[in-house]
């Protein structure tokens, strides 16, 4: 068996096409979604990632609002920009690019974001709403990577209801919120959360129908550990220096796992494009909610 590819690039392209239509519909209502980014410092990886987000915006018609500060910016200067983006009506959603400099209280900055403009879906209030809402409509953004995993599988016709999903990793961006997204009634998976300190990982991998590897530990999931027909999404990223002295980026899953898997999301090209497109979806949905709110307020005023 050789795994079929869960193609994140093609799936993201299809979702972008749908988003273009929604952005056009918003334009007819006199509203244009705007994605803001706040980048502190000159980290090359962060600069590249932010630039990619704004290229994505241009593809679907979302306005780009870019704010940059030097690495030695004070916490108060950063918070000033956060407040500015909170108040800017052109900005319907934004992200603070992480990591922030060590002298900055990252949690304080993230909590200062207006929850209605939280494009990453990671504000404590929005995570709390996700905890409290098991089913039905959720009028707050979902965390981008877990939502991207679900959409990637859905677009390939892979059913998650009733399946045992093993999530490896306990980070706030993927591992911890993944269980909340996957156990919503509309998805209905059964989730086990493991991490690098889990002592029975081999046992859990052997029984998992789906594996989402997001621990940031290079090639920690091997063919010997998984069962035939498993569905694997490789989300982890590790930078490893080889014997030749060159640095390369590796995922959490040994590529040889594809010989046992039914479906596999490669790294890169699998979940990464989905994370970025779900960010766009959150921004568009925020603009739609704001436009609907304005219409409701107008109707009330005219009543």
UniProtKB/Swiss-Prot annotation:
It catalyses: (6R)-5,10-methylene-5,6,7,8-tetrahydrofolate + NADP(+) = (6R)-5,10-methenyltetrahydrofolate + NADPH; (6R)-5,10-methenyltetrahydrofolate + H2O = (6R)-10-formyltetrahydrofolate + H(+). CDD domains: NAD_bind_m-THF_DH_Cyclohyd. Gene3D superfamilies: Leucine Dehydrogenase, chain A, domain 1, NAD(P)-binding Rossmann-like Domain. GO terms for biological process: L-histidine biosynthetic process; methionine biosynthetic process; purine nucleotide biosynthetic process; tetrahydrofolate interconversion. The keyword NADP applies. Pathway: One-carbon metabolism; tetrahydrofolate interconversion. Keywords: Amino-acid biosynthesis, Histidine biosynthesis, Hydrolase, Methionine biosynthesis, Multifunctional enzyme, NADP, One-carbon metabolism, Oxidoreductase, Purine biosynthesis. SUPFAM superfamilies: Aminoacid dehydrogenase-like, N-terminal domain (SSF53223), NAD(P)-binding Rossmann-fold domains (SSF51735). InterPro entries: Aminoacid_DH-like_N_sf (IPR046346), NAD(P)-bd_dom_sf (IPR036291), THF_DH/CycHdrlase (IPR000672), THF_DH/CycHdrlase_cat_dom (IPR020630), THF_DH/CycHdrlase_NAD-bd_dom (IPR020631). One of its GO terms (molecular function) is methenyltetrahydrofolate cyclohydrolase activity. Homodimer. Catalyzes the oxidation of 5,10-methylenetetrahydrofolate to 5,10-methenyltetrahydrofolate and then the hydrolysis of 5,10-methenyltetrahydrofolate to 10-formyltetrahydrofolate. This is Bifunctional protein FolD.
């Amino acid at each position: 068996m050789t795994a079929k590819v869960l193609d994140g690039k093609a799936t993201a392209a299809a979702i972008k096409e749908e988003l273009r239509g929604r952005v056009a519909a918003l334009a007819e209502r006199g509203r244009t979604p705007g994605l803001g980014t706040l980048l502190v410092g000159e980290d090359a990886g962060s600069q590249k990632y932010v630039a990619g987000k704004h290229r994505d915006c241009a593809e679907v018609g979302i306005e780009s609002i870019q704010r940059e500060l030097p690495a030695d910016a004070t916490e108060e200067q950063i918070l000033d920009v956060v407040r500015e983006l909170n108040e800017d009506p052109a900005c319907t959603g934004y992200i603070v690019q992480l990591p922030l400099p060590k002298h900055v209280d990252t949690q304080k900055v993230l909590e200062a974001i207006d929850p209605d403009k939280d494009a990453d879906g990671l504000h404590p209030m929005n995570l709390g709403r996700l905890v409290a809402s098991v089913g039905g409509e959720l009028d707050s953004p979902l965390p981008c990577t877990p939502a991207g995993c679900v959409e990637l599988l859905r677009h390939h016709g892979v059913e998650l209801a009733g399946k045992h999903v093993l999530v490896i990793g306990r980070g706030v961006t993927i591992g911890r919120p993944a269980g909340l997204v996957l156990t919503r009634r509309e998805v209905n998976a059964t989730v086990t959360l493991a991490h690098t300190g889990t002592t029975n990982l081999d046992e859990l991998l052997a029984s998992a129908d789906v594996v989402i590897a997001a621990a940031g530990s290079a090639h920690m999931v091997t063919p010997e550990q998984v069962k035939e027909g498993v569905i694997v999404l490789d989300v982890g990223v590790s930078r490893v220096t080889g014997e030749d002295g060159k640095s390369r980026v590796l995922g959490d899953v040994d590529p040889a796992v594809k010989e046992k898997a039914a479906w596999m999301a490669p790294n890169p090209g699998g979940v990464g494009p989905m994370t970025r497109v779900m960010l766009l979806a959150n921004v568009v949905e925020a603009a739609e909610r704001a436009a609907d709110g304005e219409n409701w307020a107008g109707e009330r005023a005219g009543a």
